[in-house]
């Protein structure tokens, strides 16, 4: 076993946000682009934050469900997630997003809300590049 080929981290407690959206498959690429330009970058560089508040944000597509987009955030801390969750800030971003992405979308699931924000990453195994 080559231990230099991977990293393993345990003992974490990183809050996880999962959002599942449904839309016309023809607009998925546009959604991903506008989501990145509005939500990802503006939440990452929100005024008043000392650093990017999330460790990662991934966008997943399921070939068996065209038009379904799953977004997964790994937040650094719940406090940083809460800061970005400021209602006025979120409403501002939603207005900007809606002005750039006029297509209908449906929030299908938000498992982190169903679990009362109880989903956390506790270990991570990653292959080194």
What are these regions (language model features)?
Residues 1-69, 74-91, 95, 103-129:
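Short S/T/G/P-rich N-terminal loop/turn motif that feeds into the first structured element of a domain
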């Amino acid at each position: 076993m080559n231990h230099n080929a991977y990293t393993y981290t345990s003992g974490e407690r990183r809050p996880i946000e999962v959002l599942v959206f449904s839309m016309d498959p023809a607009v998925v690429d546009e959604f991903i682009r506008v989501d990145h330009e509005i939500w990802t970058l503006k939440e990452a560089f929100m005024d008043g934050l000392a650093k990017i508040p999330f460790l990662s944000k991934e966008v997943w597509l399921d070939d068996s469900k065209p038009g379904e987009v799953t977004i997964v955030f790994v937040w650094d801390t719940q406090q940083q997630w809460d800061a970005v969750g400021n209602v006025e800030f979120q409403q501002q971003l939603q207005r900007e997003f809606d002005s750039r992405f006029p297509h209908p979308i449906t929030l299908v699931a938000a498992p982190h809300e169903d679990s009362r924000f109880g989903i956390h990453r506790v270990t991570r195994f990653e292959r080194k590049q």
